Amino acid sequence: MTIKTGFDPDKFVQEAGDAIIAANSEGLIIFWNKAAERIFGYMTSEVLSHSLDLIIPERLRKRHWEGYQQVMQSGQTHYGSEVLRVPAVHKDGRHLSIAFTVTLLFSDDAHIHAIAAIIRDETARWDEERALRQRAAGIEAKNS
């Protein structure tokens, strides 16, 4: 039995407040929602079929791709239920702090077709925490 709800999953994914991005087995972007446009500054038309390197800081790319390939080969990731917090890069070059989880998308023949991530921009929170840490360190230095 199908219940008619008026719910449109495609619209939900496009309109979600968090970025939803998917990349194929080579790391090329195959899906980019409106929140991804807002967070990273790239329009969907600018990123489709381009590498995730657009949003990965250069210093972290080697480590990212090693992990990406390991997931592609093993078919397993522990970031599906764990939130990963990492730096990212906006189109204009500014640094972002993002938090995300991933899900593996399998093809009918049980091979990984893509990895999808749900991403939240936590830059403001990160900046606030850094300022608090610096302030606490200053207070400790004065009291030493």
Task: Give residue spans per PLM region.
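PAS/PAS-like sensory domain cap-loop motif
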Residues: 34-47, 108-109
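PAS-family sensory domains
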Residues: 111-124
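PAS/LOV-family and closely related PAS-like sensory domains
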Residues: 44, 56-97, 106-108
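Sensory-domain boundary/capping and coupling elements
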Residues: 7, 126-144
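Adenine-nucleotide cofactor-binding loop residues
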Residues: 53, 106, 123
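Sensory-domain boundary capping and coupling elements
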Residues: 100-102, 119
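Sensory modules in modular signal-transduction proteins
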Residues: 3-37, 80, 144
